[in-house]
């Protein structure tokens, strides 16, 4: 993640205090609107439109819908011309909030679909390994793995796929 996104996310996390869950929800709703409404997104990212007009629109539409901290964050992003980074800041915020709450985010990439019992067993093993309170997982089927699976947690990759083993052997043989 770019440093800018990380800094804004960290600032919002510090401002959130005990309201972290409501900020998560508000920021998520705003980000969904930003991502889904092309006209709104184009308006906020348009360099020709004056900052005060953008802020006036944000205030008129969101003053009653967002908390003071969230509204001020959006207004700050508008004034600093950082609205294009809203999705990245949101993703970084969620990641930091989960780390603070000791929630493990993991991506499970498998060659073939796994049943829910297998997935839950895998989640539980990583939950214990990382001493996490809870686990959020995203499951993806990627047939190019040939067999097995890959688990990604932050920057760490656990590769138990056939494709990964073939690539490792190829590296050893070619050296």
UniProtKB/Swiss-Prot annotation:
Example of a GO MF term: proton-transporting ATP synthase activity, rotational mechanism
Membrane topology category: Peripheral membrane protein
Role, per record: F(1)F(0) ATP synthase produces ATP from ADP in the presence of a proton or sodium gradient. F-type ATPases consist of two structural domains, F(1) containing the extramembraneous catalytic core and F(0) containing the membrane proton channel, linked together by a central stalk and a peripheral stalk. During catalysis, ATP synthesis in the catalytic domain of F(1) is coupled via a rotary mechanism of the central stalk subunits to proton translocation.
Keyword Ribonucleoprotein: no
Keywords carried by this UniProt record: ATP synthesis, Cell membrane, CF(1), Hydrogen ion transport, Ion transport, Membrane, Transport
Protein name: ATP synthase subunit delta
Record-linked PANTHER family: ATP SYNTHASE DELTA CHAIN
SUPFAM superfamilies per record: N-terminal domain of the delta subunit of the F1F0-ATP synthase (SSF47928)
Signal peptide span: none
InterPro entries from the UniProt entry: ATP_synth_OSCP/delta_N_sf (IPR026015), ATPase_OSCP/dsu (IPR000711)
NCBIfam families: ATP_synt_delta (TIGR01145)
Transmembrane segments: none
Localization of this protein: Cell membrane
Gene source species: Ruminiclostridium cellulolyticum (strain ATCC 35319 / DSM 5812 / JCM 6584 / H10)
Transport listed as a keyword: yes
GO cellular component, one term: plasma membrane
Subunit comment: F-type ATPases have 2 components, F(1) - the catalytic core - and F(0) - the membrane proton channel. F(1) has five subunits: alpha(3), beta(3), gamma(1), delta(1), epsilon(1). F(0) has three main subunits: a(1), b(2) and c(10-14). The alpha and beta chains form an alternating ring which encloses part of the gamma chain. F(1) is attached to F(0) by a central stalk formed by the gamma and epsilon chains, while a peripheral stalk is formed by the delta and b chains.
HAMAP family tied to this protein: ATP_synth_delta_bact
Pfam families per UniProt: OSCP
Family from the record: Belongs to the ATPase delta chain family.
